[in-house]
Amino acid sequence: RQIRYLLDSEVQSSDDATKILKLPLSNVIHTLYVKVECTTGSTSAQDLDIDDVVDKIEVIGNGSEVLFSLTPPEARLYGLLDFGQPIAEKVDETANAVMFAVYPILFGRTEWDPNFWLPCSKFTDLELRIKYSPTIAATAWATGTVTITVIALMTMGGDPGQYMGTLRKTTIYDFTTVASGDEVIDLPRRLLYRRGLIYCYESGTEDGTDITKVKLSLNNDERIPFNLEWADLADLNQLLYDIKAERAMKIYRADTDVVYTITAEGQGLGLLNETMFGGEAQI
Protein backbone atom coordinates (compact mmCIF):
# COMPACT_ATOMS: atom_id res chain seq x y z
CA ARG A 1 0.00 0.00 0.00
CA GLN A 2 1.12 3.51 -0.74
CA ILE A 3 -0.38 6.97 -0.21
CA ARG A 4 0.88 9.26 -2.97
CA TYR A 5 0.61 12.93 -3.87
CA LEU A 6 -0.39 13.19 -7.51
CA LEU A 7 -0.72 16.96 -7.17
CA ASP A 8 0.45 18.99 -4.18
CA SER A 9 -1.15 22.39 -3.47
CA GLU A 10 -0.94 23.63 -7.05
CA VAL A 11 -2.27 27.19 -7.45
CA GLN A 12 -4.23 27.50 -10.69
CA SER A 13 -3.30 30.25 -13.13
CA SER A 14 -6.87 30.77 -14.36
CA ASP A 15 -10.12 31.54 -12.54
CA ASP A 16 -12.19 29.55 -15.04
CA ALA A 17 -10.69 26.36 -16.45
CA THR A 18 -10.53 22.58 -16.31
CA LYS A 19 -7.52 21.13 -14.53
CA ILE A 20 -6.54 17.90 -16.29
CA LEU A 21 -4.28 15.59 -14.32
CA LYS A 22 -2.82 12.50 -15.98
CA LEU A 23 -3.22 9.53 -13.65
CA PRO A 24 -0.74 6.62 -13.41
CA LEU A 25 -1.00 3.89 -16.06
CA SER A 26 0.41 1.17 -13.82
CA ASN A 27 -0.44 -0.36 -10.44
CA VAL A 28 -3.82 0.00 -8.70
CA ILE A 29 -5.77 3.04 -7.50
CA HIS A 30 -8.24 2.39 -4.70
CA THR A 31 -9.26 5.95 -3.84
CA LEU A 32 -8.55 9.52 -4.92
CA TYR A 33 -8.97 12.51 -2.62
CA VAL A 34 -9.45 15.83 -4.42
CA LYS A 35 -8.88 18.86 -2.19
CA VAL A 36 -9.89 22.25 -3.57
CA GLU A 37 -9.11 25.51 -1.77
CA CYS A 38 -10.15 29.07 -2.53
CA THR A 39 -9.87 32.39 -0.67
CA THR A 40 -12.92 34.52 0.03
CA GLY A 41 -13.22 38.11 -1.18
CA SER A 42 -12.18 41.24 0.69
CA THR A 43 -15.70 41.75 2.09
CA SER A 44 -17.21 38.28 2.70
CA ALA A 45 -18.57 35.23 0.91
CA GLN A 46 -22.09 34.78 2.21
CA ASP A 47 -23.96 31.61 1.17
CA LEU A 48 -20.86 30.25 -0.57
CA ASP A 49 -18.63 27.22 -0.09
CA ILE A 50 -16.28 25.19 -2.30
CA ASP A 51 -19.26 23.57 -4.02
CA ASP A 52 -19.69 27.00 -5.63
CA VAL A 53 -16.09 26.98 -6.89
CA VAL A 54 -16.04 23.54 -8.51
CA ASP A 55 -18.46 22.67 -11.33
CA LYS A 56 -17.69 18.99 -11.90
CA ILE A 57 -15.14 16.29 -11.07
CA GLU A 58 -14.52 13.47 -13.54
CA VAL A 59 -12.24 10.49 -14.12
CA ILE A 60 -12.11 9.52 -17.79
CA GLY A 61 -10.38 6.47 -19.28
CA ASN A 62 -9.14 6.25 -22.87
CA GLY A 63 -10.74 9.57 -23.75
CA SER A 64 -14.39 8.56 -23.41
CA GLU A 65 -14.96 5.90 -20.73
CA VAL A 66 -16.59 7.68 -17.80
CA LEU A 67 -15.44 6.20 -14.49
CA PHE A 68 -16.51 9.06 -12.25
CA SER A 69 -18.58 12.14 -13.09
CA LEU A 70 -20.35 14.07 -10.34
CA THR A 71 -21.04 17.64 -9.33
CA PRO A 72 -19.69 18.71 -5.91
CA PRO A 73 -23.08 18.35 -4.13
CA GLU A 74 -23.40 14.83 -5.56
CA ALA A 75 -19.83 13.91 -4.59
CA ARG A 76 -20.45 15.35 -1.13
CA LEU A 77 -23.56 13.20 -0.65
CA TYR A 78 -21.85 10.05 -1.89
CA GLY A 79 -19.06 10.75 0.57
CA LEU A 80 -21.68 10.99 3.30
CA LEU A 81 -22.97 7.53 2.34
CA ASP A 82 -19.52 5.98 1.91
CA PHE A 83 -18.17 7.20 5.26
CA GLY A 84 -21.32 7.91 7.29
CA GLN A 85 -20.11 11.43 8.03
CA PRO A 86 -19.57 14.68 6.12
CA ILE A 87 -16.56 15.20 3.89
CA ALA A 88 -13.61 17.12 5.31
CA GLU A 89 -14.15 20.82 4.70
CA LYS A 90 -13.76 24.32 6.09
CA VAL A 91 -16.59 26.82 5.60
CA ASP A 92 -15.66 30.37 6.63
CA GLU A 93 -17.63 33.22 5.08
CA THR A 94 -15.55 36.02 6.59
CA ALA A 95 -13.24 38.18 4.47
CA ASN A 96 -9.93 36.81 3.12
CA ALA A 97 -10.52 33.35 4.59
CA VAL A 98 -9.30 30.14 2.96
CA MET A 99 -12.10 27.62 2.46
CA PHE A 100 -11.52 24.04 1.36
CA ALA A 101 -13.35 20.79 0.68
CA VAL A 102 -12.01 17.28 0.13
CA TYR A 103 -14.03 15.22 -2.35
CA PRO A 104 -13.44 11.44 -2.15
CA ILE A 105 -13.49 9.22 -5.25
CA LEU A 106 -13.81 5.55 -4.27
CA PHE A 107 -13.39 2.89 -6.94
CA GLY A 108 -14.34 0.20 -4.43
CA ARG A 109 -16.73 -0.36 -1.56
CA THR A 110 -14.23 1.05 0.94
CA GLU A 111 -11.04 3.10 0.80
CA TRP A 112 -8.78 0.03 0.46
CA ASP A 113 -11.19 -2.50 -1.07
CA PRO A 114 -9.09 -5.59 -2.06
CA ASN A 115 -11.54 -6.73 -4.76
CA PHE A 116 -12.98 -3.62 -6.39
CA TRP A 117 -10.45 -1.05 -7.60
CA LEU A 118 -9.17 0.80 -10.66
CA PRO A 119 -6.67 -1.29 -12.69
CA CYS A 120 -4.59 1.51 -14.19
CA SER A 121 -2.69 -0.75 -16.61
CA LYS A 122 -5.89 -1.56 -18.52
CA PHE A 123 -5.93 2.00 -19.88
CA THR A 124 -3.75 3.81 -22.38
CA ASP A 125 -4.92 7.17 -21.06
CA LEU A 126 -6.39 8.02 -17.67
CA GLU A 127 -7.36 11.55 -16.66
CA LEU A 128 -8.76 13.34 -13.62
CA ARG A 129 -10.65 16.44 -14.74
CA ILE A 130 -11.67 19.20 -12.33
CA LYS A 131 -13.80 21.98 -13.79
CA TYR A 132 -13.84 25.15 -11.68
CA SER A 133 -15.18 28.70 -12.15
CA PRO A 134 -15.41 30.78 -8.95
CA THR A 135 -17.19 34.12 -9.13
CA ILE A 136 -14.55 36.80 -8.63
CA ALA A 137 -15.82 39.66 -6.45
CA ALA A 138 -15.27 41.31 -3.09
CA THR A 139 -18.38 39.49 -1.84
CA ALA A 140 -17.41 36.13 -3.37
CA TRP A 141 -13.90 34.81 -4.19
CA ALA A 142 -10.45 36.35 -4.63
CA THR A 143 -8.81 35.99 -8.03
CA GLY A 144 -5.93 33.57 -8.52
CA THR A 145 -6.56 31.56 -5.35
CA VAL A 146 -7.96 28.23 -6.59
CA THR A 147 -5.56 25.58 -5.26
CA ILE A 148 -5.81 21.85 -5.94
CA THR A 149 -4.29 18.83 -4.18
CA VAL A 150 -4.83 15.21 -5.25
CA ILE A 151 -3.88 12.24 -3.08
CA ALA A 152 -4.12 8.62 -4.25
CA LEU A 153 -4.43 5.44 -2.18
CA MET A 154 -2.62 2.81 -4.26
CA THR A 155 -1.41 -0.78 -4.24
CA MET A 156 2.01 -1.05 -5.87
CA GLY A 157 3.70 -3.98 -7.60
CA GLY A 158 0.75 -6.35 -7.78
CA ASP A 159 -2.95 -6.83 -7.22
CA PRO A 160 -4.33 -6.41 -3.68
CA GLY A 161 -6.65 -9.40 -4.16
CA GLN A 162 -8.96 -11.04 -6.68
CA TYR A 163 -10.20 -8.37 -9.08
CA MET A 164 -14.02 -8.33 -9.21
CA GLY A 165 -14.63 -5.00 -10.91
CA THR A 166 -14.46 -1.22 -10.65
CA LEU A 167 -17.24 0.79 -9.04
CA ARG A 168 -18.07 3.97 -10.88
CA LYS A 169 -20.26 6.91 -9.87
CA THR A 170 -21.94 8.99 -12.56
CA THR A 171 -24.98 11.21 -12.98
CA ILE A 172 -27.45 9.39 -15.21
CA TYR A 173 -30.35 11.86 -15.08
CA ASP A 174 -31.04 15.37 -13.85
CA PHE A 175 -33.86 17.81 -14.43
CA THR A 176 -35.47 20.99 -13.13
CA THR A 177 -39.23 21.43 -13.00
CA VAL A 178 -41.92 23.61 -11.43
CA ALA A 179 -44.68 21.10 -12.19
CA SER A 180 -46.01 18.27 -10.03
CA GLY A 181 -46.56 14.71 -11.19
CA ASP A 182 -44.57 11.52 -11.81
CA GLU A 183 -41.09 11.63 -13.33
CA VAL A 184 -40.19 8.31 -15.00
CA ILE A 185 -36.47 7.66 -15.40
CA ASP A 186 -35.26 4.86 -17.67
CA LEU A 187 -32.11 3.43 -16.11
CA PRO A 188 -29.22 2.28 -18.35
CA ARG A 189 -28.90 -1.50 -18.45
CA ARG A 190 -25.33 -2.02 -19.69
CA LEU A 191 -23.77 -2.42 -16.24
CA LEU A 192 -24.70 -3.84 -12.85
CA TYR A 193 -26.02 -1.52 -10.14
CA ARG A 194 -24.75 -1.50 -6.58
CA ARG A 195 -26.35 1.68 -5.26
CA GLY A 196 -28.28 4.69 -6.49
CA LEU A 197 -28.56 8.16 -5.05
CA ILE A 198 -31.49 10.54 -5.54
CA TYR A 199 -30.70 14.15 -4.75
CA CYS A 200 -33.21 17.00 -4.68
CA TYR A 201 -32.71 20.57 -3.52
CA GLU A 202 -34.90 23.65 -3.57
CA SER A 203 -33.82 26.72 -1.64
CA GLY A 204 -36.08 27.38 1.33
CA THR A 205 -37.99 24.11 0.98
CA GLU A 206 -38.01 21.38 3.62
CA ASP A 207 -36.62 17.97 2.73
CA GLY A 208 -39.36 15.56 1.62
CA THR A 209 -41.60 18.25 0.17
CA ASP A 210 -40.58 18.16 -3.50
CA ILE A 211 -40.16 14.37 -3.73
CA THR A 212 -42.87 12.44 -1.90
CA LYS A 213 -42.44 8.86 -3.16
CA VAL A 214 -39.83 6.72 -4.90
CA LYS A 215 -40.53 3.50 -6.80
CA LEU A 216 -38.18 1.06 -8.52
CA SER A 217 -39.94 -0.94 -11.23
CA LEU A 218 -38.48 -3.83 -13.26
CA ASN A 219 -39.99 -4.97 -16.57
CA ASN A 220 -43.09 -2.75 -16.31
CA ASP A 221 -43.91 -3.67 -12.69
CA GLU A 222 -43.17 -7.37 -13.10
CA ARG A 223 -41.01 -6.85 -10.02
CA ILE A 224 -41.07 -3.88 -7.66
CA PRO A 225 -38.08 -3.98 -5.26
CA PHE A 226 -39.46 -0.98 -3.39
CA ASN A 227 -42.21 1.64 -3.54
CA LEU A 228 -41.68 3.89 -0.53
CA GLU A 229 -42.56 7.27 0.83
CA TRP A 230 -39.60 9.64 0.74
CA ALA A 231 -39.56 10.07 4.53
CA ASP A 232 -39.53 6.29 5.09
CA LEU A 233 -36.73 5.83 2.56
CA ALA A 234 -34.71 8.51 4.37
CA ASP A 235 -35.27 6.74 7.70
CA LEU A 236 -34.10 3.42 6.23
CA ASN A 237 -30.98 5.10 4.88
CA GLN A 238 -30.26 6.44 8.34
CA LEU A 239 -30.54 2.94 9.80
CA LEU A 240 -28.44 1.32 7.06
CA TYR A 241 -25.65 3.87 6.86
CA ASP A 242 -25.74 5.57 10.29
CA ILE A 243 -25.51 8.94 8.57
CA LYS A 244 -24.38 11.94 10.60
CA ALA A 245 -25.63 14.88 8.55
CA GLU A 246 -23.71 17.65 10.26
CA ARG A 247 -21.79 20.69 9.01
CA ALA A 248 -19.43 23.03 10.84
CA MET A 249 -19.71 26.54 9.38
CA LYS A 250 -18.30 29.93 10.30
CA ILE A 251 -20.91 32.26 8.86
CA TYR A 252 -21.18 35.99 8.40
CA ARG A 253 -24.78 37.06 9.02
CA ALA A 254 -27.09 39.73 10.37
CA ASP A 255 -29.48 38.88 13.22
CA THR A 256 -32.46 38.02 11.00
CA ASP A 257 -30.63 36.33 8.11
CA VAL A 258 -31.45 32.77 7.04
CA VAL A 259 -28.74 30.11 6.90
CA TYR A 260 -29.09 27.10 4.60
CA THR A 261 -26.98 24.25 5.94
CA ILE A 262 -27.98 22.00 3.00
CA THR A 263 -28.33 18.89 5.13
CA ALA A 264 -31.39 16.67 5.07
CA GLU A 265 -31.92 16.92 8.82
CA GLY A 266 -30.24 19.29 11.26
CA GLN A 267 -28.42 17.29 13.94
CA GLY A 268 -27.57 20.20 16.19
CA LEU A 269 -26.68 23.86 16.28
CA GLY A 270 -23.97 25.60 18.23
CA LEU A 271 -23.42 29.36 18.23
CA LEU A 272 -19.68 29.89 18.56
CA ASN A 273 -19.81 33.67 18.70
CA GLU A 274 -23.08 35.45 19.42
CA THR A 275 -21.68 38.81 18.35
CA MET A 276 -21.29 37.34 14.87
CA PHE A 277 -24.39 35.18 14.67
CA GLY A 278 -26.82 37.31 16.64
CA GLY A 279 -29.60 36.03 18.85
CA GLU A 280 -32.38 35.73 16.27
CA ALA A 281 -30.75 34.06 13.28
CA GLN A 282 -33.08 31.63 11.50
CA ILE A 283 -31.68 28.18 10.81
Residue ranges and their predicted role:
Residues R1-I283:
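Beta-strand-centric surfaces of beta-sandwich/beta-rich domains
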